[in-house]
């Protein structure tokens, strides 16, 4: 054939292929147009954390036996445990317990290996501050109960604001809340 005709046929095929690709990408764009937004307005709306979320550590002073297992299993030897040996009853008495959340990696080993379950992970994740020394929590600050995101009336949680279809096979968890 003539080189001009074959060049024109290749040009026509390339034009049709390009139009098909543009049409496919436009259809994908249109299919995403009717979705709900994934982003939230953070200070006023908060996502509900999952059940196994590892937030701030909660400490119960009365349950602690000062065994220092939490210090031994911590990869960075973070919890500071001060205790005194009571010779008359031959037991340790806990004097001070503190964790610096500026250094903590929230691995959860201390919670997992605690024999008396005096440590637990909370859903509290807003630990930001202007002074890093305020992140060093003692037993009083660690014993404070966390503020519940669901119970705060000033914050609209995503659970209440979006329509959620609960299926019979899937239990309701944070993945069904955030995946629209």
From Swiss-Prot:
Subunit details: NDH is composed of at least 16 different subunits, 5 of which are encoded in the nucleus.
Reactions listed under catalytic activity: a plastoquinone + NADH + (n+1) H(+)(in) = a plastoquinol + NAD(+) + n H(+)(out); a plastoquinone + NADPH + (n+1) H(+)(in) = a plastoquinol + NADP(+) + n H(+)(out)
4Fe-4S ferredoxin-type domain ranges (all copies): 55-84, 95-124
GO MF annotation terms: 4 iron, 4 sulfur cluster binding; iron ion binding; NADH dehydrogenase (ubiquinone) activity; quinone binding
SUPFAM superfamilies: 4Fe-4S ferredoxins
Protein name (record): NAD(P)H-quinone oxidoreductase subunit I, chloroplastic
This protein's GO CC annotations: chloroplast thylakoid membrane
Function: NDH shuttles electrons from NAD(P)H:plastoquinone, via FMN and iron-sulfur (Fe-S) centers, to quinones in the photosynthetic chain and possibly in a chloroplast respiratory chain. The immediate electron acceptor for the enzyme in this species is believed to be plastoquinone. Couples the redox reaction to proton translocation, and thus conserves the redox energy in a proton gradient.
Matches recorded under InterPro entries: 4Fe4S_Fe-S-bd (IPR017896), 4Fe4S_Fe_S_CS (IPR017900), NADH_quinone_OxRdtase_chainI (IPR010226), NDHI (IPR004497)
Organism (species): Nandina domestica
Chief subcellular location: plastid
Domain of life: Eukaryota
Uppermost EC category: translocase
Family of the protein in this entry: Belongs to the complex I 23 kDa subunit family.
Membrane topology, record value: Peripheral membrane protein
Cell compartment(s), UniProt: Plastid, Chloroplast thylakoid membrane
Needed co-factor(s): [4Fe-4S] cluster
Record: residues binding [4Fe-4S] cluster 1: 64, 67, 70, 114
